[in-house]
Amino acid sequence: MTAGPTPGAVDAPSLHIPVLRDEVVDALAPRDGAVLVDGTFGAGGYTAALLASAACTVWAIDRDPAAVARGHALAARHPGRLTVLDGTFGCMESLLAAHGITRVDGIALDIGVSSPQIDDPSRGFSFRFDGPLDMRMGSHGTTAADIVNERDEAEIADIVWRYGEERHSRRVARAIVARRREAPITRTLDLAEIVRSVVPKSKDGIDPATRTFQALRIAVNDELGELERGLAAAERLLAPGGRLAVVTFHSLEDRVVKEFLRSRSAAAPAPSRHLPAPADAPAPTFRLIARSGVTPAPAELAANPRARSARLRSAERTSAPARRLGDAA
């Protein structure tokens, strides 16, 4: 009989501690024999913690080649317990089906950019380092440089407003178009300087370039569309009693998760308060674990300032059939 892992004994080589790591593990409640999915492997912190918490197996997914390489290194230390798949979590259903997996017991999603991506200047995610204006989480597709140099002013303003909620989005777009007439904008620090020249400093000390960089990153990677696809896939994949844990870092992401879980954790409303709900109304597919979500404790915020806007929302799958597109909330 093989000894199970020691709870809390996370692999020493996995030094990165993800935001709300222990809370995510608690929400998923791993048990021996469970099949779990880490849909956003990143630096591997959640996967390592899950593997250490029970004699479970984990299927890890990431589109970033560097993350996939890290995953294979971790898998070598856990023979037969960790499989790493190259792809996006929005496609997890087909990725897992290709390996014969059609039901799982838990899914963890950490939405947005990972710490290794932010801290690598060559990836172009950060306005703190000089690097190519890329921002792709994978290795294919449109870059941030393509957007700022090729889209028209109105479309750039719309992206910055819609995905960054930047109230000075028109100023930003106007400044970008004016600068690119002189020369293409290809470096992160160049773009940051352009944005800072037209967006005033905020009282909370957040860099004026923050919202614009967030907006471009979301647009480049279709992050909100990916999140919607991932949530729908999780609903179909989770077995009754399975858990979903989603960590978000800004209001746009959190709104998508909150609305999805709200709609899936409530029966369809009656057409009138004087009439019963329709007999064919879809039953709730999730039960909320923490209605308002979980935020980092003061100790974690002190140790990791990047955690300041994080929120964990989690839910348990019921036995009701997954909703179809167009089903009432």
From Swiss-Prot:
Subcellular location(s) of the protein: Cytoplasm
Instruction: Report the catalytic activity.
Output: cytidine(1402) in 16S rRNA + S-adenosyl-L-methionine = N(4)-methylcytidine(1402) in 16S rRNA + S-adenosyl-L-homocysteine + H(+)
Annotated region (Disordered) at: 297-329
Chief subcellular location equals: cytoplasm
Task: Fetch the Gene3D superfamilies from UniProt.
Answer: Putative methyltransferase TM0872, insert domain, Vaccinia Virus protein VP39
Q: Which GO terms describe its biological process?
A: rRNA base methylation
Q: What class of enzyme is it?
A: transferase
Q: Does the keyword Ligase apply?
A: no
Q: Which residues bind S-adenosyl-L-methionine?
A: G44, G45, Y46, D62, D110, Q117
Instruction: Provide the alphabetized UniProt keywords.
Output: Cytoplasm, Methyltransferase, rRNA processing, S-adenosyl-L-methionine, Transferase
Cellular component annotations (GO), alphabetically ordered:
cytoplasm
For this protein, the Enzyme Commission number is 2.1.1.199
Query: Single GO molecular-function term?
Result: rRNA (cytosine-N4-)-methyltransferase activity
Q: Record's superkingdom? A: Bacteria
The answer on whether this UniProt entry bears the keyword rRNA processing reads: yes
NCBIfam families per record: 16S rRNA (cytosine(1402)-N(4))-methyltransferase RsmH
Member of which family? Belongs to the methyltransferase superfamily. RsmH family.
Function summary: Specifically methylates the N4 position of cytidine in position 1402 (C1402) of 16S rRNA.
Which protein is depicted?
Answer: Ribosomal RNA small subunit methyltransferase H
